[in-house]
């Protein structure tokens, strides 16, 4: 089963384990592959 990550969860930008719908992996800093799940701004 696929679990998604909620806001504030640690994530990797290029990983299959992604943030929940409506969220995205915001990089810690430009060029980083690590980040934190944050709400998308539509």
UniProtKB/Swiss-Prot annotation:
Keyword Ligase: no
One protein family per Pfam: Tachystatin_B
Keywords, in A-Z order: Antibiotic, Antimicrobial, Disulfide bond, Fungicide, Knottin, Secreted
Cellular localization per UniProt: Secreted
Any one GO biological process: killing of cells of another organism
Annotated disulfide bonds: 4-20, 11-25, 19-37
A cellular component term, taken from the record's GO annotations: extracellular region
UniProt comment concerning the protein's domains: The presence of a 'disulfide through disulfide knot' structurally defines this protein as a knottin.
Function: Exhibits stronger antimicrobial activity against the Gram-positive bacteria (S.aureus (IC(50) is 7.4 ug/ml)) and fungi (C.albicans (IC(50) is 3.0 ug/ml) and P.pastoris (IC(50) is 0.1 ug/ml)) than Gram-negative bacteria (E.coli no inhibition at 100 ug/ml). Binds to chitin (4.3 uM are required to obtain 50% of binding). Does not cause hemolysis on sheep erythrocytes. Has no blocking activity on the P-type calcium channel.
Protein name as annotated: Tachystatin-B2
Native organism: Tachypleus tridentatus
């Amino acid at each position: 089963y696929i679990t998604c990550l909620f806001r504030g969860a640690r994530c990797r930008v290029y990983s299959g384990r992604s943030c929940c719908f409506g969220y995205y992996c915001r990089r810690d800093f430009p060029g980083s592959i690590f980040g934190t799940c944050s709400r998308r701004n539509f």
